Amino acid sequence: MGFFNLSKKQATTQSKPVSNSERTSGFEYLKRQDVYFDGACQSLRPQPVIDSLVEYYQKHNSCGERVKYQWGKVTDQKVEQTRDQVLKLLKLKKRDYFVSFTLNTTYGINLLLSQFDFKAAGIKTVVTSDIEHNSVFLATQSAATRAKLERLVLSREADGSLPISEIPDNSLVVINVMSNIDGRTLKNLRDIITYVHQKQGIIVLDAAQAMAHNYQLLQETEADAICFSAHKMYGASLGVMVVRKTLLENLNLTFLGGGMVDDVEKNSYLLSAEHDDKIHTAFEAGLQAWGEIIALGAAISWLEKLPASAKECLESCETKLFDFLKSQPKIHCLNQEKSTTFSFYVEGIDSHLLAEALSDQNIMVRSGYFCVHYYLDHKMHFPPLIRVSLGYQTTESDINKLITILRKFN
Protein backbone atom coordinates (compact mmCIF):
# COMPACT_ATOMS: atom_id res chain seq x y z
CA MET A 1 0.00 0.00 0.00
CA GLY A 2 3.04 2.24 -0.18
CA PHE A 3 1.86 4.15 -3.25
CA PHE A 4 -0.96 5.71 -1.21
CA ASN A 5 1.71 7.43 0.91
CA LEU A 6 -0.33 6.97 4.07
CA SER A 7 0.88 5.96 7.48
CA LYS A 8 -1.11 5.21 10.60
CA LYS A 9 0.59 8.14 12.27
CA GLN A 10 -0.60 10.51 9.54
CA ALA A 11 -4.17 9.26 9.72
CA THR A 12 -4.49 9.36 13.47
CA THR A 13 -2.89 12.76 13.96
CA GLN A 14 -5.25 14.44 11.51
CA SER A 15 -8.51 13.24 13.01
CA LYS A 16 -9.72 13.18 16.57
CA PRO A 17 -9.53 9.70 18.19
CA VAL A 18 -12.88 8.16 18.95
CA SER A 19 -13.84 8.08 22.59
CA ASN A 20 -16.02 5.13 23.50
CA SER A 21 -18.34 7.55 25.28
CA GLU A 22 -19.18 9.03 21.87
CA ARG A 23 -20.66 5.77 20.66
CA THR A 24 -24.28 4.77 21.09
CA SER A 25 -24.84 2.70 24.22
CA GLY A 26 -24.16 -0.96 23.49
CA PHE A 27 -20.96 -0.47 21.52
CA GLU A 28 -18.61 0.44 24.34
CA TYR A 29 -16.61 -2.71 23.60
CA LEU A 30 -15.54 -1.36 20.19
CA LYS A 31 -11.93 -0.22 20.23
CA ARG A 32 -11.43 3.50 19.78
CA GLN A 33 -9.32 3.11 16.66
CA ASP A 34 -11.65 0.66 14.91
CA VAL A 35 -14.02 2.16 12.34
CA TYR A 36 -16.63 -0.31 11.09
CA PHE A 37 -18.34 0.70 7.83
CA ASP A 38 -19.78 -2.65 6.69
CA GLY A 39 -23.18 -2.74 8.34
CA ALA A 40 -24.90 -3.39 5.00
CA CYS A 41 -23.24 -6.82 5.09
CA GLN A 42 -23.76 -7.43 8.79
CA SER A 43 -24.21 -4.94 11.58
CA LEU A 44 -22.20 -4.93 14.74
CA ARG A 45 -24.11 -6.38 17.69
CA PRO A 46 -24.84 -4.18 20.70
CA GLN A 47 -23.93 -5.62 24.07
CA PRO A 48 -27.53 -6.54 25.07
CA VAL A 49 -27.76 -8.78 22.00
CA ILE A 50 -24.46 -10.46 22.80
CA ASP A 51 -25.57 -10.90 26.42
CA SER A 52 -28.85 -12.46 25.30
CA LEU A 53 -27.06 -15.04 23.16
CA VAL A 54 -24.60 -15.89 25.92
CA GLU A 55 -27.47 -16.20 28.41
CA TYR A 56 -29.18 -18.79 26.22
CA TYR A 57 -26.05 -20.95 26.01
CA GLN A 58 -25.23 -20.62 29.70
CA LYS A 59 -28.65 -20.66 31.36
CA HIS A 60 -31.22 -22.51 29.22
CA ASN A 61 -29.49 -24.17 26.26
CA SER A 62 -32.22 -26.46 24.92
CA CYS A 63 -34.18 -27.63 21.89
CA GLY A 64 -37.26 -25.53 21.29
CA GLU A 65 -40.74 -27.03 20.76
CA ARG A 66 -39.55 -30.53 21.64
CA VAL A 67 -38.87 -30.92 25.35
CA LYS A 68 -40.75 -30.83 28.64
CA TYR A 69 -37.95 -29.76 30.97
CA GLN A 70 -37.75 -26.22 32.33
CA TRP A 71 -34.89 -24.97 30.17
CA GLY A 72 -36.92 -25.87 27.09
CA LYS A 73 -39.99 -24.08 28.42
CA VAL A 74 -37.93 -20.90 28.90
CA THR A 75 -36.61 -21.21 25.35
CA ASP A 76 -40.10 -21.74 23.92
CA GLN A 77 -41.46 -18.72 25.76
CA LYS A 78 -38.67 -16.44 24.56
CA VAL A 79 -38.83 -17.67 20.97
CA GLU A 80 -42.57 -17.05 20.86
CA GLN A 81 -41.98 -13.61 22.32
CA THR A 82 -39.58 -12.82 19.47
CA ARG A 83 -42.17 -13.86 16.88
CA ASP A 84 -44.62 -11.46 18.50
CA GLN A 85 -42.00 -8.69 18.59
CA VAL A 86 -41.37 -9.00 14.85
CA LEU A 87 -45.06 -8.62 14.04
CA LYS A 88 -45.41 -5.76 16.50
CA LEU A 89 -42.41 -3.95 15.00
CA LEU A 90 -43.99 -4.19 11.55
CA LYS A 91 -47.48 -3.45 12.90
CA LEU A 92 -48.90 -6.58 11.30
CA LYS A 93 -51.73 -8.65 12.76
CA LYS A 94 -51.12 -12.16 14.02
CA ARG A 95 -54.41 -13.30 12.55
CA ASP A 96 -53.08 -12.50 9.05
CA TYR A 97 -49.32 -13.16 9.23
CA PHE A 98 -46.88 -15.59 10.80
CA VAL A 99 -43.13 -15.49 11.40
CA SER A 100 -40.70 -18.27 10.49
CA PHE A 101 -36.95 -18.32 11.01
CA THR A 102 -34.29 -19.58 8.65
CA LEU A 103 -30.65 -19.05 7.67
CA ASN A 104 -30.74 -15.63 5.99
CA THR A 105 -32.69 -13.47 3.53
CA THR A 106 -31.42 -15.40 0.50
CA TYR A 107 -32.54 -18.69 2.02
CA GLY A 108 -35.97 -17.32 2.87
CA ILE A 109 -36.59 -16.00 -0.64
CA ASN A 110 -35.48 -19.30 -2.15
CA LEU A 111 -37.67 -21.30 0.24
CA LEU A 112 -40.67 -19.33 -1.03
CA LEU A 113 -39.89 -19.31 -4.73
CA SER A 114 -38.68 -22.91 -4.98
CA GLN A 115 -41.93 -24.20 -3.44
CA PHE A 116 -44.27 -21.74 -5.17
CA ASP A 117 -47.06 -23.26 -7.28
CA PHE A 118 -47.28 -20.76 -10.13
CA LYS A 119 -50.13 -22.58 -11.85
CA ALA A 120 -52.29 -22.75 -8.74
CA ALA A 121 -51.67 -19.05 -8.09
CA GLY A 122 -52.45 -18.10 -11.69
CA ILE A 123 -49.10 -16.34 -12.09
CA LYS A 124 -48.01 -15.63 -15.68
CA THR A 125 -44.94 -13.40 -15.23
CA VAL A 126 -42.08 -13.08 -12.74
CA VAL A 127 -41.13 -9.44 -12.16
CA THR A 128 -38.09 -7.99 -10.45
CA SER A 129 -35.87 -4.90 -10.83
CA ASP A 130 -32.42 -4.08 -12.14
CA ILE A 131 -30.85 -3.11 -8.80
CA GLU A 132 -31.60 -6.33 -6.96
CA HIS A 133 -29.12 -8.24 -4.86
CA ASN A 134 -28.28 -11.67 -6.25
CA SER A 135 -30.53 -13.17 -3.57
CA VAL A 136 -33.48 -11.87 -5.61
CA PHE A 137 -31.92 -11.72 -9.06
CA LEU A 138 -30.82 -15.36 -9.10
CA ALA A 139 -33.86 -16.71 -7.28
CA THR A 140 -36.23 -15.09 -9.79
CA GLN A 141 -34.15 -16.42 -12.70
CA SER A 142 -34.37 -19.93 -11.29
CA ALA A 143 -38.08 -19.68 -10.50
CA ALA A 144 -39.03 -18.34 -13.93
CA THR A 145 -36.97 -21.01 -15.68
CA ARG A 146 -38.51 -23.79 -13.60
CA ALA A 147 -42.05 -22.52 -14.22
CA LYS A 148 -41.35 -21.75 -17.91
CA LEU A 149 -42.54 -18.17 -17.44
CA GLU A 150 -41.37 -14.82 -18.75
CA ARG A 151 -39.12 -12.92 -16.35
CA LEU A 152 -39.33 -9.13 -16.56
CA VAL A 153 -36.52 -6.95 -15.16
CA LEU A 154 -37.78 -3.39 -14.65
CA SER A 155 -35.51 -0.37 -14.27
CA ARG A 156 -35.80 1.44 -10.96
CA GLU A 157 -35.95 5.23 -10.99
CA ALA A 158 -33.11 7.28 -9.51
CA ASP A 159 -35.22 7.79 -6.37
CA GLY A 160 -35.78 4.04 -6.01
CA SER A 161 -39.38 3.89 -7.18
CA LEU A 162 -40.62 1.24 -9.60
CA PRO A 163 -42.76 2.07 -12.69
CA ILE A 164 -46.09 0.59 -11.64
CA SER A 165 -47.66 0.74 -15.09
CA GLU A 166 -45.03 -1.68 -16.43
CA ILE A 167 -46.06 -4.49 -14.07
CA PRO A 168 -48.24 -7.01 -15.97
CA ASP A 169 -51.37 -8.57 -14.54
CA ASN A 170 -50.97 -11.86 -12.67
CA SER A 171 -47.34 -11.23 -11.74
CA LEU A 172 -45.15 -12.53 -8.97
CA VAL A 173 -43.18 -9.41 -8.01
CA VAL A 174 -39.98 -9.83 -5.98
CA ILE A 175 -38.16 -6.58 -5.16
CA ASN A 176 -36.05 -4.91 -2.50
CA VAL A 177 -37.32 -2.18 -0.23
CA MET A 178 -33.88 -0.59 0.11
CA SER A 179 -30.84 -0.96 -2.14
CA ASN A 180 -27.59 -2.36 -0.78
CA ILE A 181 -25.73 -0.17 -3.30
CA ASP A 182 -26.77 3.35 -2.38
CA GLY A 183 -29.62 2.99 0.07
CA ARG A 184 -32.33 4.23 -2.29
CA THR A 185 -35.73 3.08 -1.05
CA LEU A 186 -38.84 1.87 -2.83
CA LYS A 187 -40.66 5.20 -2.61
CA ASN A 188 -43.94 3.89 -4.05
CA LEU A 189 -43.97 0.66 -2.04
CA ARG A 190 -47.55 0.91 -0.79
CA ASP A 191 -48.92 1.85 -4.21
CA ILE A 192 -47.10 -1.12 -5.76
CA ILE A 193 -48.55 -3.56 -3.24
CA THR A 194 -52.07 -2.25 -3.86
CA TYR A 195 -51.62 -2.38 -7.64
CA VAL A 196 -50.15 -5.89 -7.69
CA HIS A 197 -53.01 -7.24 -5.61
CA GLN A 198 -55.60 -5.46 -7.75
CA LYS A 199 -54.05 -7.18 -10.77
CA GLN A 200 -54.28 -10.65 -9.17
CA GLY A 201 -50.57 -10.74 -8.41
CA ILE A 202 -48.37 -11.64 -5.45
CA ILE A 203 -45.55 -9.55 -4.01
CA VAL A 204 -42.51 -10.67 -2.00
CA LEU A 205 -40.26 -8.06 -0.42
CA ASP A 206 -36.53 -8.24 0.26
CA ALA A 207 -36.29 -6.04 3.35
CA ALA A 208 -32.74 -7.00 4.32
CA GLN A 209 -31.34 -3.48 4.05
CA ALA A 210 -34.40 -1.66 5.36
CA MET A 211 -34.96 -3.27 8.74
CA ALA A 212 -32.07 -1.71 10.67
CA HIS A 213 -32.85 1.96 10.09
CA ASN A 214 -36.00 2.12 7.92
CA TYR A 215 -38.36 -0.55 9.25
CA GLN A 216 -41.08 2.11 9.39
CA LEU A 217 -41.33 1.82 5.60
CA LEU A 218 -42.75 -1.67 6.06
CA GLN A 219 -45.16 -1.00 8.88
CA GLU A 220 -48.76 -1.93 8.05
CA THR A 221 -47.85 -2.88 4.48
CA GLU A 222 -49.77 -5.84 3.14
CA ALA A 223 -47.13 -7.69 1.16
CA ASP A 224 -47.56 -11.43 0.78
CA ALA A 225 -44.12 -12.08 2.27
CA ILE A 226 -41.28 -10.06 3.75
CA CYS A 227 -37.81 -11.58 4.06
CA PHE A 228 -34.92 -10.06 6.00
CA SER A 229 -31.86 -10.89 8.08
CA ALA A 230 -31.47 -10.32 11.80
CA HIS A 231 -27.72 -9.87 11.34
CA LYS A 232 -28.32 -6.71 9.31
CA MET A 233 -30.47 -5.17 12.06
CA TYR A 234 -28.16 -5.63 15.04
CA GLY A 235 -29.22 -9.19 15.80
CA ALA A 236 -27.30 -12.47 15.63
CA SER A 237 -26.97 -14.42 12.36
CA LEU A 238 -30.51 -15.39 11.37
CA GLY A 239 -33.04 -15.17 8.53
CA VAL A 240 -36.62 -14.04 9.09
CA MET A 241 -39.71 -14.68 6.98
CA VAL A 242 -42.94 -12.80 7.63
CA VAL A 243 -45.60 -14.53 5.56
CA ARG A 244 -49.27 -13.91 4.89
CA LYS A 245 -51.12 -17.04 5.98
CA THR A 246 -53.12 -17.26 2.76
CA LEU A 247 -49.89 -17.54 0.74
CA LEU A 248 -49.52 -21.14 1.92
CA GLU A 249 -52.42 -22.01 -0.39
CA ASN A 250 -50.04 -21.40 -3.30
CA LEU A 251 -47.08 -23.39 -1.96
CA ASN A 252 -46.20 -27.06 -2.26
CA LEU A 253 -44.06 -27.69 0.80
CA THR A 254 -41.30 -30.08 -0.24
CA PHE A 255 -38.41 -28.99 1.99
CA LEU A 256 -39.36 -31.11 4.98
CA GLY A 257 -37.88 -32.38 8.21
CA GLY A 258 -38.15 -32.71 11.96
CA GLY A 259 -40.34 -30.22 13.74
CA MET A 260 -42.71 -29.87 10.76
CA VAL A 261 -44.97 -32.86 11.29
CA ASP A 262 -47.54 -34.12 13.77
CA ASP A 263 -47.34 -37.68 12.49
CA VAL A 264 -45.46 -39.76 9.92
CA GLU A 265 -46.61 -43.07 8.46
CA LYS A 266 -44.77 -45.29 5.99
CA ASN A 267 -45.80 -43.29 2.91
CA SER A 268 -47.54 -40.23 4.30
CA TYR A 269 -47.29 -37.46 6.87
CA LEU A 270 -49.39 -34.81 8.58
CA LEU A 271 -47.96 -31.29 8.57
CA SER A 272 -48.05 -29.32 11.81
CA ALA A 273 -48.54 -26.12 9.79
CA GLU A 274 -52.14 -27.13 9.20
CA HIS A 275 -52.78 -25.93 12.76
CA ASP A 276 -52.76 -22.15 13.13
CA ASP A 277 -50.67 -22.21 16.31
CA LYS A 278 -47.97 -24.18 14.47
CA ILE A 279 -48.20 -22.51 11.07
CA HIS A 280 -44.67 -21.13 11.45
CA THR A 281 -43.29 -24.67 11.14
CA ALA A 282 -44.03 -24.54 7.38
CA PHE A 283 -40.51 -23.19 6.82
CA GLU A 284 -38.71 -24.50 9.90
CA ALA A 285 -37.35 -27.93 9.04
CA GLY A 286 -35.05 -29.32 11.71
CA LEU A 287 -33.60 -27.67 14.80
CA GLN A 288 -33.61 -23.90 14.70
CA ALA A 289 -31.09 -21.33 15.92
CA TRP A 290 -32.92 -20.81 19.20
CA GLY A 291 -30.28 -18.58 20.76
CA GLU A 292 -30.13 -16.37 17.67
CA ILE A 293 -33.92 -16.10 17.56
CA ILE A 294 -33.99 -14.96 21.17
CA ALA A 295 -31.16 -12.53 20.46
CA LEU A 296 -33.28 -10.98 17.69
CA GLY A 297 -35.85 -10.17 20.34
CA ALA A 298 -33.13 -8.40 22.29
CA ALA A 299 -32.09 -6.50 19.15
CA ILE A 300 -35.65 -5.32 18.53
CA SER A 301 -35.98 -4.18 22.14
CA TRP A 302 -32.68 -2.32 21.83
CA LEU A 303 -33.75 -0.63 18.57
CA GLU A 304 -37.08 0.45 20.00
CA LYS A 305 -35.41 2.00 23.04
CA LEU A 306 -32.75 3.94 21.14
CA PRO A 307 -32.67 7.58 22.25
CA ALA A 308 -33.38 10.33 19.74
CA SER A 309 -29.78 11.44 20.10
CA ALA A 310 -28.55 8.17 18.53
CA LYS A 311 -30.75 8.65 15.48
CA GLU A 312 -29.77 12.31 15.19
CA CYS A 313 -26.08 11.38 15.33
CA LEU A 314 -26.51 8.82 12.54
CA GLU A 315 -28.40 11.31 10.37
CA SER A 316 -25.70 13.91 10.95
CA CYS A 317 -23.03 11.42 9.89
CA GLU A 318 -25.01 10.58 6.75
CA THR A 319 -25.26 14.26 5.82
CA LYS A 320 -21.59 14.98 6.45
CA LEU A 321 -20.36 12.05 4.37
CA PHE A 322 -22.83 12.70 1.54
CA ASP A 323 -21.88 16.37 1.30
CA PHE A 324 -18.18 15.47 1.22
CA LEU A 325 -18.44 12.71 -1.38
CA LYS A 326 -20.54 14.85 -3.73
CA SER A 327 -18.11 17.77 -3.43
CA GLN A 328 -15.00 15.88 -4.53
CA PRO A 329 -14.25 16.07 -8.28
CA LYS A 330 -12.35 12.78 -8.41
CA ILE A 331 -14.82 10.82 -6.31
CA HIS A 332 -17.80 9.46 -8.23
CA CYS A 333 -20.58 8.76 -5.73
CA LEU A 334 -23.62 6.80 -6.91
CA ASN A 335 -25.92 8.22 -4.25
CA GLN A 336 -28.57 10.73 -5.27
CA GLU A 337 -29.42 11.41 -1.65
CA LYS A 338 -27.97 10.72 1.77
CA SER A 339 -28.38 7.29 3.29
CA THR A 340 -26.67 4.91 5.66
CA THR A 341 -25.17 3.25 2.57
CA PHE A 342 -22.82 4.94 0.08
CA SER A 343 -21.06 3.53 -2.99
CA PHE A 344 -18.36 5.34 -4.94
CA TYR A 345 -15.09 5.03 -6.81
CA VAL A 346 -12.06 7.29 -7.00
CA GLU A 347 -10.65 8.14 -10.41
CA GLY A 348 -7.43 6.28 -11.12
CA ILE A 349 -7.55 4.23 -7.91
CA ASP A 350 -8.35 0.52 -7.77
CA SER A 351 -11.14 0.13 -5.22
CA HIS A 352 -9.82 -3.15 -3.86
CA LEU A 353 -6.43 -1.58 -3.20
CA LEU A 354 -8.12 1.43 -1.62
CA ALA A 355 -10.10 -0.87 0.67
CA GLU A 356 -6.86 -2.51 1.79
CA ALA A 357 -5.26 0.89 2.36
CA LEU A 358 -8.22 1.94 4.50
CA SER A 359 -7.94 -1.33 6.39
CA ASP A 360 -4.35 -0.39 7.23
CA GLN A 361 -5.87 2.60 9.05
CA ASN A 362 -8.40 0.35 10.85
CA ILE A 363 -11.24 1.51 8.58
CA MET A 364 -13.39 -1.38 7.39
CA VAL A 365 -15.26 -0.94 4.07
CA ARG A 366 -16.41 -3.21 1.25
CA SER A 367 -15.05 -3.21 -2.29
CA GLY A 368 -16.40 -4.80 -5.45
CA TYR A 369 -19.94 -5.22 -6.77
CA PHE A 370 -21.68 -6.26 -3.53
CA CYS A 371 -23.63 -9.14 -5.13
CA VAL A 372 -25.27 -6.77 -7.65
CA HIS A 373 -23.22 -7.87 -10.65
CA TYR A 374 -25.88 -7.37 -13.31
CA TYR A 375 -26.65 -3.73 -12.55
CA LEU A 376 -23.24 -2.44 -11.51
CA ASP A 377 -21.04 -4.34 -13.94
CA HIS A 378 -23.07 -5.41 -16.96
CA LYS A 379 -25.68 -2.65 -17.18
CA MET A 380 -23.91 0.43 -15.82
CA HIS A 381 -20.32 -0.70 -16.50
CA PHE A 382 -18.97 0.74 -13.27
CA PRO A 383 -15.52 -0.29 -12.09
CA PRO A 384 -15.42 -2.11 -8.74
CA LEU A 385 -16.69 0.25 -6.06
CA ILE A 386 -16.09 1.15 -2.44
CA ARG A 387 -19.11 0.79 -0.17
CA VAL A 388 -19.33 2.62 3.14
CA SER A 389 -22.32 1.64 5.27
CA LEU A 390 -22.96 3.39 8.55
CA GLY A 391 -24.68 2.19 11.70
CA TYR A 392 -25.58 3.27 15.21
CA GLN A 393 -21.98 2.60 16.25
CA THR A 394 -20.79 5.30 13.82
CA THR A 395 -19.51 8.58 15.26
CA GLU A 396 -18.60 11.91 13.73
CA SER A 397 -14.98 11.08 14.51
CA ASP A 398 -15.30 7.96 12.34
CA ILE A 399 -16.54 10.07 9.44
CA ASN A 400 -13.80 12.64 9.98
CA LYS A 401 -11.15 9.91 9.89
CA LEU A 402 -12.46 8.59 6.58
CA ILE A 403 -12.76 12.07 5.07
CA THR A 404 -9.21 12.97 6.13
CA ILE A 405 -7.86 10.01 4.17
CA LEU A 406 -10.10 10.40 1.11
CA ARG A 407 -9.13 14.07 0.75
CA LYS A 408 -5.63 12.91 -0.18
CA PHE A 409 -6.93 11.59 -3.49
CA ASN A 410 -8.28 14.94 -4.74
Question: Where do the language-model regions lie?
Answer:
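Pyridoxal 5′-phosphate
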Residues: 1-410
